Amino acid sequence: MKVVLFCGGLGTRLGELTEDVPKPLVKIGYRPILWHLMKYYAHYGHKDFILCLGYKADKIKDYFLNYNEYISNDFTMSEGGRNIELMQSDIADWRITFVDTGLRANIGQRLKAVEKHLAGEEMFLANYADGLTNLPLPRIIDFFQESGKVGCFLCVKPPHSFHVVKLQENGLIDSIEYVRDTDTMINGGFFVFRKSIFDFMKPGEELVVEPFQRLIEEHQLIGYQYPDWWCMDTFKEHQVLTDMYNEGKAPWEVWRARETDPAPTQR
């Protein structure tokens, strides 16, 4: 399946990290989060990518046009560096389509802009490109295919330690608890769609607002629950991911693990 990656946002909550590069190019270790995400999909055989570009689109194009294989691969050097033999390649079998979808476009507009590049695809994958997981990808795809629905997305626990408060009209507090201790789930940004998703979209609409509401009304939208998910929406979250990587604890790197299928989780 083709993979649509939304790479056009401003990433303002990452502060100085996105002054010179777009959010998808913010690095975790030696490589940007976009690379980690693409490696995840490629590990499961999905290597045909469509990048929906916007803010600093030139930076993303330049990154891949001048891709340096030696940073993340073993190689043998001889003749004083004139001859270099790579032991493996990251992206040799990837196909990447770069599409400028506008600086201020929302997710729905960006998806609509690449519809023609999905011609002939009965289903496709999509992603916000700002989060990582170790979810065995075939699970959510199989779950979606068996459902016969139009759309599916990963449902995860909120990553923050906010408190959920219930109160009465007079202001009296009934309860207070950590949001992660409640049944609250959020959209993890990993999607599977049938091509008919475009029938539910109108010009200018945000994907998860009007189109998703139509899917809900027609019982065509489902969610897949999974516990392991790491977002990179803030400077603090980026630091958490960087620390995990530096400590050798990067569970989203399923391409490195010997056993990539964690214990089943409730759907």
Range-by-range predicted roles:
Residues 1-67, 98:
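N-terminal glycine-rich phosphate-binding loop and ensuing alpha1 helix
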Residues 3-5, 51, 126, 151-154, ...:
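Structural beta-sheet core signal
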Residues 25, 164-167, 223:
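A structural signal for short hydrophobic beta-strand segments in well-ordered beta-sheet cores
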Residues 33-36, 109-113, 211:
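Well-ordered alpha-helical segments embedded in enzymatic catalytic cores
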Residues 43, 116, 214-217:
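Solvent-exposed polar/charged
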Residues 59-169:
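Conserved beta-loop-beta/alpha segment of the NTase-like Rossmann-fold superfamily
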Residues 122-125, 132-145, 157-160, 172-267:
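Catalytic-core segments of class I nucleotidyltransferases/pyrophosphorylases
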